[in-house]
Regions:
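Long, charged, low-complexity intrinsically disordered regions
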Residues: 1-56, 60-61, 67-69, 81, ...
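A generic structural motif
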Residues: 72-76
Length: 100
């Protein structure tokens, strides 16, 4: 990758990623699945290249099982506020999140 007088292309990619974080609409909600078990579902991150890493970090930080499937992150248990707080700490705009 070449550099110009405005900075490296890597810094441009970082800027674009930050702009993407600002325009994403994230919805965090509780759902009931098999056998009456609660799960936390996160939508709106499917366009992100690092959605697998985000899923792994959420599972590790919250201490629960989960998966990324069909454009949704699904975590075992009701962790809506914890997910919101972790995403805000990761740099996502709190105003772009809807917690139901």
């Amino acid at each position: 990758m070449s550099e110009d007088h405005y900075g490296s292309t890597n810094s441009m990619n970082d800027i674009l990623r930050e702009l993407d974080k600002e325009k994403i609409r994230i919805v965090i909600f509780k759902d009931i699945r098999k056998f009456g078990k609660s799960v936390t579902v996160i939508t709106g991150l499917q366009e992100r290249e690092d959605v697998g890493l985000i899923t792994k970090q959420l599972k590790t930080n919250i201490g629960t099982g989960g998966t990324y499937k069909d454009g949704q992150i699904v975590l075992q248990g009701d962790h809506r506020e914890a997910v919101k707080n972790l995403l805000v700490r990761r740099g996502f705009n709190e105003d772009s999140m809807e917690v139901r």
